[in-house]
Structure formats: structure tokens, C-alpha cells
Amino acid sequence: MKIIYHDKNVHVFQSALFQTNSTVVETNDIILVVDPNWLPDEVGQIRHYTEGLVKASKKPVWLLFTHSDYDHIIGYNAFSDIAEGVIASRAFDENLGQEVILEQIKQFDDEYYITRPYLIDYPSVSYIVESERQVLEIGQTKLTFFNAEGHNPDGIFTIVNNVFIAGDYLCDVEFPYIYYSSWAYQNTLNKIEPLLEAFDIQLFISGHGNPTTDRDEVLRRRDEALEYIGNVRGSIRANKYFDFDKYMADKKFQFPRIMRRFHEGNLNIMRQEEFGH
């Protein structure tokens, strides 16, 4: 598993699968592990690194789940025995599709003959985020949360120590993947610029692809995401063809075969939003 970013307080691990990121943040008071994922050896590497921090610092481990997509919760039980707290949104905790999500993990493991040294479970949340700008203080550490619906219905943004943990928004390797609502997604994107300023963000970490320390890069990604949503919605309203191949070539995205499936999913959701069918 690659470490694609590190400084004295933050390590971002990236899986070989979908360039999915897991983040470990050490503050003055806690070790925060975010979305530990994919393959057993990769999850084990994150666990090993976390154990080293615990041994050296004696700080408690907290888990944070940005949203409930199965790839982001797949490593939960590799850490549940050492986690003092588990953070996620109210919608995450009350998700009625928990068994469906667990089945997705089991199907993935079956397909590739993967065995794990831990049981597959849906995270048991001990600290529930249920309001905009909710704050959790642990010692001197302050975590501030914002609702981030759109990609799915239960996402949250988290800001801690000038680090913006965004979940599956503004990933530089993909356009918006919309599983819930394009309008909610758009509203979530519009929150980002004010937060960059209000919290003096020094590091932005998306759920897939590359983190960035460049605010202009964050805003460029934001603008391109809004442009994609607007253009797709416009093509649907005008009953015009959206040239996906040209879009992929223009934006230099690398994975057209699978990304076409996600684009078609976006089209289906946005057609339902426009026409109700």
C-alpha cells in the first residue's frame, strides 16, 4: 500500500483498488483513523502503523467513517478492538441498507477468494454527527463536522487541525459519482470554498486520488465537478447527447470502461430528478 502523503501529523495511505484513501491523523490528544480500506494486507499495514503510534504516544484511537459505501467501511473490524470511539453521521447509523452493504463486501471477497483476519460488520457508531457545524472536542483537539449529502445520503465533511477530510468529493481521478441526489451534491460542493477560508485549510483529502495542499486546486476540482453536473443536467433538459468519450478525453480521465457505468448511473438519477421516471 502506497503512502501518498505524509507530514509530522498526517499519513494518507492509498489502496491499489480505485486509488482509495485511508487517512491517519495524530493530534495532541487522539489518533484518528479514517475509512480504513480495501485489501487485508492494506488494512493490516494501516493497523500496524496505528499500533506504532499508540505504543509511542499512548493516545486513544478514534475511527471516522466519511460515508457508508462498502469500500469505506470494509476495514472497520480490524480496528474495533482498539477504537475508543467511532464517528459517523446519524444517517449512517440509521441506514436501513446495512445488510445490503455487508453483502457487497462479502460478494467482493467471494469474487476474489479473499479471506480476512477479522469479521465483516457494519460500524457501531458511538459519536453521532447530526447537525451542521457540530463540534467534538477531545482534550485540545476540535473536530468540526458538516453534512455532505449527494454522493450518498449519509456523508460528512470533517475538519481537524486545518485538515479537510472530504470523503468522495473532489477526487481528481473521477467526475462526481452521484448515488443519491445531484441537487444535494451541488449544494455540498457549494459549501467547500467558504470552509477553505473559515478554517484556513492546509490539506484537502478526498476519498480517492491525490490529496492537495493547494487551495486553487481544490477550487479547480470544485468548478469542474459543478460544470459536469450542470452540463449533464442541461443535456437531459434539452434532450441532447452528452459526448462522454469527448468529455473523458478532454479531462484526461484514465478509466473509461468502468467510469462509463458511473456516468450512466448519474444519467439515470438525474433523469428521475427531471422527469420523475
Each PLM stretch: what is its role?
Residues Q134-Q140, F145-D154:
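Charge-patterned, long linear interaction tracts outside catalytic cores
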Residues K2-G52, F157-C171:
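Conserved beta-strand hairpin/beta-sheet module of binuclear metal-dependent hydrolase folds
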Residues N9, V25, D35, T50, ...:
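Divalent metal-coordination and catalytic microenvironments
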Residues L53-K58, I138-G139, E197-F199:
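Glycine-rich phosphate-binding loop signature in dinucleotide/nucleotide-binding domains
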Residues P194-Q202, N210-H277:
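Accessory terminal helices/loops
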Residues L32-D35, W62-L64, F145:
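Short catalytic-loop micro-motif centered on adjacent basic/acidic residues
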Residues E42-G44, H48-R133, N231:
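Active-site HxH/HxHxD metal-binding segment of metal-dependent hydrolases
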Residues I31, W38-L39, N147-E149, P153-R221:
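Metallo-beta-lactamase
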